[in-house]
Amino acid sequence: MSIDVDAVSDLIRDVSARVIDPRFRTLDDHQIHQKKPGDFVTDADRQAERELGAAVTKYAGGIVVGEESAFADPTILDAVSDADLAWVIDPIDGTKNFVHGSVDHGVMLAQLNRGETVRGWIWQPQHGHMWFAEHGAGVTCDGDEVTRGDSHSPVRAATTHEVYKIPSPVVEWRMAKWCCAVDYPLVCQDENDVTVYQHSYPWDHLPGALMVREVGGVVRTVEGAEYGPRETSGKLIVAADEEAVSYTHLTLPTNRE
């Protein structure tokens, strides 16, 4: 079937409005859990994943892999690469921010056809922005085309790693937002040139990686491999262009004398 991208956007907004937004800054302690120390999940995450997964499969079919279901059973990721249609969901990206009352959180959804990310959505409910990318068709924010220029000098790079505290003449390090649903758009809209991530889980990165590539950027492991849905453990460099990648590599701890 032909998938109406606006209809999918509406499904995301609907789940957010009913399940996530009413719980923002109103969570009780018993609604907040930790999968491991510092790795938060809330009742809103779990319900939103269930409801969004049910909504997209009712609308278009396919299989669903969500962050919380994959945490419970990592083997479900194996089916994504071979499925004709798969949906990868991060019900609340930036859950730690959400728990602590920060507006920097979002809902992310990727559509994969036989292991290739063909569409990606990022909904930022407290900022009111819907980001969308389609392979070969570019990126939009609230329906408006998104483009960006070459990287800045010095390169504007964000991370949560301690390297952001190290002065560099070629890279201006800053603290990332602890939320891929915010940090990826910051690269797309020319605010940052680079984001370095410590993990590469598909629900965190597939929608944003497509967006960055669609505005001319690159998304690779620090070892140089192109990022894809099978990558689940490596560190990533998300960059506006090759020059930004090169300068960032010079300042990473493994490349410093």
Question: What are these model-predicted stretches?
Answer:
Residues R148-L252:
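An extended, acidic
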